[in-house]
C-alpha cells in the first residue's frame, strides 16, 4: 500500500468514477500526490489515502499493441477521431495505431489516446484502462514528489479527512 494525498474543492466520502477527471494535459483518472504540503496547494480539502496499486502503466517501456487497439476500438469518440487518419475505416485503424505507438512509452501512448479518442469521456477512459488491467500511473517530478493518476477507484482507501 502507498500513502498519498487527495485535494479538491469539496469533501469526498468515497471515490467513484465520478471523481475521474482530466489533469493538466495528462491521462484521465483520480489525481493524488505523495506529499501532503503539495496537496494543500491544490485545494482546500485534503485527505490522506492508501493506494493499493497492482499493475502500473510504464513510464519507461512501450505498451502492448493489443491494448492500444482495444483502447481505440472501444473509445466513445472513435468514429470522429478515426476520420482524422483516413476516410477508409480499416486504414484509419492502422494509421491511428501507428500514430499512438510513436508515443514511445506506455504512459505517453495512453496520454495520446486520452486526448484524441476519449475527449469529454474521462470515466470511459478509466474503465477501459481497468479492463486492460491497469490501476494507475505514477509520475515522478524529480523533487521526490510523485503524482499518482488512479483509474480504479477500488484501489483507494480513505485514511482520514
Where are the regions that the model predicts?
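Active-site and NAD+-binding cores of ADP-ribose-processing enzymes
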Residues: 1-31, 36, 43-161
Amino acid at each position: 500500500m502507498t500513502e498519498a494525498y487527495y485535494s479538491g474543492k469539496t469533501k469526498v466520502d468515497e471515490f467513484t468514477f465520478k471523481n475521474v477527471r482530466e489533469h493538466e494535459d495528462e491521462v484521465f483518472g483520480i489525481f493524488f500526490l505523495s506529499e501532503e504540503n503539495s496537496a494543500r496547494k491544490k485545494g482546500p480539502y485534503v485527505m490522506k489515502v492508501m493506494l493499493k496499486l497492482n499493475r502500473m502503466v510504464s513510464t519507461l517501456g512501450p505498451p502492448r499493441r493489443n491494448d492500444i487497439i482495444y483502447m481505440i476500438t472501444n473509445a466513445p469518440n472513435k468514429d470522429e477521431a478515426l476520420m482524422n487518419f483516413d476516410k477508409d475505416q480499416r486504414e484509419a485503424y492502422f494509421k491511428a495505431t501507428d500514430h499512438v505507438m510513436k508515443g514511445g512509452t506506455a504512459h505517453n501512448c495512453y496520454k495520446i489516446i486520452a486526448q484524441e479518442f476519449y475527449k469529454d469521456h474521462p470515466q470511459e477512459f478509466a474503465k477501459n484502462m481497468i479492463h486492460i488491467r491497469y490501476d494507475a500511473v505514477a509520475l515522478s517530478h524529480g523533487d521526490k514528489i510523485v503524482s499518482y493518476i488512479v483509474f480504479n477507484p477500488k484501489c483507494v482507501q480513505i485514511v482520514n479527512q
